[in-house]
């Protein structure tokens, strides 16, 4: 009976997906917010409601119908990216991992998915979003160097490095923004539909009361250290000019670097804030520290980032901040 119910629900939701996709793409709005956010959100909910088996069945049948009706391989390709990201968010949300682990791992895996979908799209329909965006950034660099006096005073190496950073940060924001947005909104929608249970319910409560739990949730220690080692290694490779000739691999490595760096700094600042509170500092002092740190981070990025990460690592090992706040958060969630 349960299997029949899930199959019926998956079939109904698949029909809705097909109809809405055809209308959205046919009206011209499908290549905007719909394929990038609504599709992954939709399949995140299907996963929570129907489970992995029926979600995969729904995805395969839905994509085949959309492709058969529209005859547009591009739509099927970009929709498949959204579906995979939605299912990924569903899988991560059910794991006994921290919220930050889910978001970081989702971003890292999402970067790989995005690149491979782009490769597939370039081979099938002759269009590569990454290459097109890279050409746009390159054109901007040449234009600003020629027409903006402030840029003409800098050496070519600096300009190339600056716009390369802009390119890779912008590319990184795509999987990061998609995963974080779909994950958070999906849990709120899932709660409204009463499909959350177990770990997904706990993570929903953490997000719902994030103002309270923001200083208590971190990436796991192992994942944190892995990203520290990776960012250090990647920085040294860049410093000594060690690069791969494969553009897509280079894109993935840079996405990993900037995603990891963001979560390392975020965890470090949150950990230091939490440590200050355990030592009796007031919220006003914590806020003042945060404002001053952000100012220093904008002025001396690498110095501020390294100091915060190393200091957080030292107090975490010395005082067991992760264990302390994990236990405290569990107590608050059960009350």
Role assignments for model-derived ranges:
Residues 40-45, 66-67, 83-95, 109-114, ...:
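Alpha-helical transmembrane segments and their membrane-interface exit regions
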Residues 3-6, 159-284, 288-290, 295, ...:
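Alpha-helical transmembrane segments and their cytosolic interface
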Residues 57-65, 102-111, 282-295, 307-309:
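Central hydrophobic cores of alpha-helical transmembrane segments
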Residues 22-32, 63-91:
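Interfacial aromatic-anchored transmembrane helix boundaries in multi-pass membrane proteins
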Residues 118-165:
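Membrane-interface interhelical loops and short interface/amphipathic helices
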Residues 8-14, 79-122:
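Short helix-perturbing small/polar motifs within transmembrane alpha-helices
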Residues 1-58:
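Hydrophobic transmembrane alpha-helices
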Residues 7-12, 56-60, 76, 80, ...:
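Hydrophobic alpha-helical transmembrane segments
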């Amino acid at each position: 009976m349960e299997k029949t119910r899930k199959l019926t629900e998956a079939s109904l939701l698949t029909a809705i997906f097909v109809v809405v996709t055809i209308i959205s793409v046919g009206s011209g709005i499908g290549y905007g917010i719909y394929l990038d956010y609504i599709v992954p959100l939709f399949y995140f909910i299907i996963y929570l409601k129907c489970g992995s088996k029926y979600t995969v069945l729904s995805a395969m049948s839905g994509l085949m119908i959309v492709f058969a009706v529209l005859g547009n391989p591009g739509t099927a390709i970009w929709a498949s990216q959204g579906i995979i990201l939605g299912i990924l968010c569903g899988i991560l949300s059910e794991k006994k991992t921290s919220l930050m682990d889910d978001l970081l791992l989702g971003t890292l895996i999402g970067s790989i998915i995005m690149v491979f979908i782009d490769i597939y799209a370039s081979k099938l329909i002759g269009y590569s979003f990454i290459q097109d965006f890279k050409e746009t950034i390159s054109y901007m660099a040449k234009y600003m160097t020629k027409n903006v006096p402030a840029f003409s005073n800098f050496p070519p190496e600096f300009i190339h490095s600056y716009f390369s950073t802009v390119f890779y940060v912008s590319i990184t924001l795509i999987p990061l923004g998609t995963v974080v947005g779909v994950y958070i909104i999906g849990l709120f929608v899932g709660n409204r539909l009463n499909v959350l249970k177990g770990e997904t319910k706990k993570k929903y409560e953490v997000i719902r009361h994030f103002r309270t739990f923001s200083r208590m949730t971190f990436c796991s220690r192992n994942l944190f250290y892995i990203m520290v080692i990776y960012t250090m290694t990647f920085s040294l490779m860049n410093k000594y000019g060690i690069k791969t000739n494969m553009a897509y691999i280079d894109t993935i490595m840079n996405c990993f670097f900037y995603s990891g760096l963001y979560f390392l700094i975020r965890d470090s600042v949150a950990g230091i804030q939490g440590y200050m509170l355990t030592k009796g500092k007031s919220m006003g002092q914590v806020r003042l520290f945060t404002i001053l740190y952000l100012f220093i981070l904008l002025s001396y990025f690498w110095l501020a980032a390294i100091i915060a990460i190393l200091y957080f690592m030292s107090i975490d090992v010395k005082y067991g901040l992760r264990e302390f706040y994990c236990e405290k958060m569990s107590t608050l969630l059960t009350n």
